[in-house]
Design a protein with these regions (language model features):
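Short, charged cytosolic
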Residues: 1-10
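The first (N-terminal) embedded transmembrane alpha-helix
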Residues: 29-45
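Interfacial loop-to-helix junctions that mark the boundaries of transmembrane helices
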Residues: 52-63
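Membrane-interface interhelical connector segments
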Residues: 132-148
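Single conserved hydrophobic/aromatic residue that forms the stacking wall/gate
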Residues: 146-157
């Protein structure tokens, strides 16, 4: 990776740490919004994928993946704070010694909690609105599926 790109990531890490320190409520709200968009994209992706399930499952999976990518675009366009993106940016900043590991931990924690809260709120609204059809299934599943690492990810085994 060119060093200029590393510098850009490092500067972004400094800006994220500064935003969290100076405006924690604003930063948390950005993380919640990222969680909202992830849930919206997940629901829409499932609808698109299930629409094609009986006729052409391969197209359903492809289109479902494309639709889910829209969430990432929305998150970038509104400047929301997605935990996975913060992992990349903050790690570069810490390795380049532009931010401390304590700042990295704070950004990761707040963005993770904000993403989870956003997922939880919109998932509950989705279920209480009766849109899920099976409230018991969706109540906790949506948030846990997209915010929690799997045991394989933690252990490193594949």
């Amino acid at each position: 990776m060119p060093y200029d790109d590393v510098q850009k990531f490092s500067e972004a890490a400094v800006n994220k740490a500064k935003l969290l320190k100076e405006h924690p409520g604003k930063y948390f709200l950005r993380a919640v919004m990222a969680g909202f968009f992830i849930v919206v994209a997940m629901i829409f992706s499932n609808v698109v994928g299930n629409t094609f399930q009986s006729t052409d499952p391969a197209w359903g999976k492809l289109l479902g993946g494309i639709v889910f990518a829209i969430a990432v675009l929305l998150i970038v366009f509104i400047g929301a704070e997605l935990f996975t993106g913060n992992n990349l940016v903050m790690a570069f900043g810490a390795y380049d010694k532009k931010v401390s590991w304590a700042q990295v931990g704070k950004v990761w924690l707040v963005s993770y909690i904000g993403n989870f809260v956003g997922c939880l709120i919109l998932s509950v609204i989705f279920v209480l609105a009766g849109a899920s059809g099976t409230a018991d299934y969706y109540a906790g599943f949506i948030c846990l599926l997209y915010t929690s690492p799997s045991p394989r990810d933690i252990s490193g085994s594949r």
